[in-house]
Amino acid sequence: DDVVREVDALAHRMGMIRSALVNQFLVEYVFVSTPERRWNDIFEAIEELMTPTRELVPFFAPGSSTMSLKSSLSYKYRPTVKYEVDLSNGDAQTMGTLNIVFRTQSAALISAMTSFFRLWVQIEDKCLAPLLGSSISCALYDGRFVRPLAMPRGKALTADDVAGAISAYVQLFDRLLKGYLDGSLSASDVEMAYRGDLRSRTLLI
């Protein structure tokens, strides 16, 4: 009981809850990895990879299972798209989810983005799903496109491995989305670019 009280007091002074402080002790002194530490390592690596591009602005809170990457569209009033990486809901088949969130009152932009999301699903069903050995269960809601992040098979993954795969995927999606919306890329151009990128990927997510 005395130990618990001391831990609670220390956690209070550090502005933390008891479980978070215990996890920190495990990581720093016993070298036991925790989900929070792994999420943090992945997000720090993504932040480092994304910062030089300036196309996507990363943000995450230490210990959080989610990270957001904000991108501005070349469209009237400069609407933004937010890519939310959520690693808290992974299972044996997935690492988590990628949520693509957009807010706009423009019916034309909503229609164009919906068209792109449907095109993306068609391309991945045709090109990626056979390589993964399973379908990709995407969902489109009002202002949100949700895509599960597949768990790569056959190897132990470091935080840098995961960060590299997620960063490359988000950058590809963002680049092709913008090209499709500004008219510089047709549906066939998007598919061709996707296929070319797929051939160079070391991890399939």
Where are these regions (language model features)?
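Charged, low-complexity intrinsically disordered regulatory/assembly segments
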Residues: R103-I205
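Short, basic amphipathic alpha-helical segments that act as recognition/interaction helices
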Residues: M16-W39
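Short, positively charged interaction helices/loops
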Residues: F31-P62
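Short intrinsically disordered coil segments
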Residues: A11-G15, G164
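Short amphipathic alpha-helix starts
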Residues: D1-A11, L26
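Residue-level signal for alpha-helical context at structural boundaries
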Residues: F25, W39-N40, E44, A187, ...
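Amphipathic, interaction-prone secondary-structure segments
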Residues: V57-A107
